[in-house]
C-alpha cells in the first residue's frame, strides 16, 4: 500500500519529465480545501494536483473538486491502484488522471488521462494565489495606480476590472506565472515587510 509520503517526491520527478520546466509551490488553502500540489508551468498555466493514496477515501473529493475548479487552469488527480478503476466516476472529464503503483520496489506512474482546460476556473479565486508584493509588480507592469494604502482584496479587484479590455487573460496568465517562478519562500517575509514599510 502506498501512502501520500511515498508518492509525493517521486511524483515531482514524474511531473517534471512530463511537463518540462515547472515549479512546485507549497500547499495552498483554497476555500474549505487544501491543494496537495500547486504546479506552475512554462506554458503559463497553473495546475492543481490532488493526491489520493491507497489509504485515502473519496469522502471529501466532491467538495475538493469544486474548490480546485475555482483556482486552477488545469487539474490532475493522482491515485493509488485501489482507486484506479473508479476514479473516472468521481472527477470531471476535463481532469487529468495519473495512476501510481509499486513495481519491483519502485514507485511507478502512468498517465491514464491528460488534463484538459478547466472551464470553471474563476479569476476572482485564481488571483488570490498572488502575494501583495507580487500584485504590486502586476500593477507596475500594467501602468496601474499603486493603491499603496488599499487592501490586497481591493487591488485584486482593480486588476480584474481591467480584464479583458486593458489586460488580456493571456497577459495576466503570463505575468502571474513569471512571478510565481521567481517566488522565494525564504525571503518573502522580508519582501512583505519592505512593501508595507514603503506603503506608509
PLM segments and residue spans:
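Surface-exposed, flexible loop/turn segments at secondary-structure boundaries
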Residues: 32, 45, 83, 105
Amino acid at each position: 500500500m502506498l501512502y501520500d509520503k511515498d508518492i509525493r517526491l517521486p511524483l515531482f520527478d514524474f511531473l517534471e519529465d512530463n511537463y518540462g520546466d515547472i515549479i512546485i509551490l507549497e500547499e495552498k488553502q483554497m476555500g474549505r480545501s487544501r491543494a496537495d500540489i500547486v504546479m506552475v508551468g512554462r506554458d503559463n498555466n497553473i495546475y492543481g494536483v490532488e493526491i489520493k493514496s491507497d489509504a485515502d477515501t473519496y469522502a471529501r473529493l466532491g467538495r475538493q473538486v469544486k474548490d480546485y475548479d475555482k483556482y486552477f487552469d488545469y487539474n490532475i488527480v493522482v491515485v493509488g491502484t485501489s482507486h484506479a478503476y473508479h476514479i473516472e466516476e468521481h472527477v470531471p472529464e476535463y481532469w487529468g488522471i495519473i495512476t501510481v503503483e509499486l513495481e519491483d520496489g519502485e514507485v511507478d506512474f502512468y498517465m491514464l488521462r491528460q488534463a484538459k482546460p478547466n472551464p470553471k476556473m474563476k479569476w476572482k479565486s485564481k488571483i488570490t494565489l498572488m502575494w501583495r508584493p507580487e500584485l504590486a509588480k502586476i500593477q507596475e507592469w500594467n501602468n496601474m495606480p499603486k493603491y499603496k494604502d488599499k487592501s490586497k482584496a481591493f487591488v485584486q479587484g482593480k486588476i480584474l476590472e481591467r480584464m479583458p479590455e486593458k489586460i488580456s487573460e493571456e497577459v495576466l496568465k503570463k505575468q502571474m506565472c513569471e512571478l510565481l517562478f521567481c517566488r522565494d519562500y525564504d525571503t518573502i517575509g522580508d519582501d512583505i515587510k519592505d512593501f508595507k514599510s514603503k506603503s506608509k
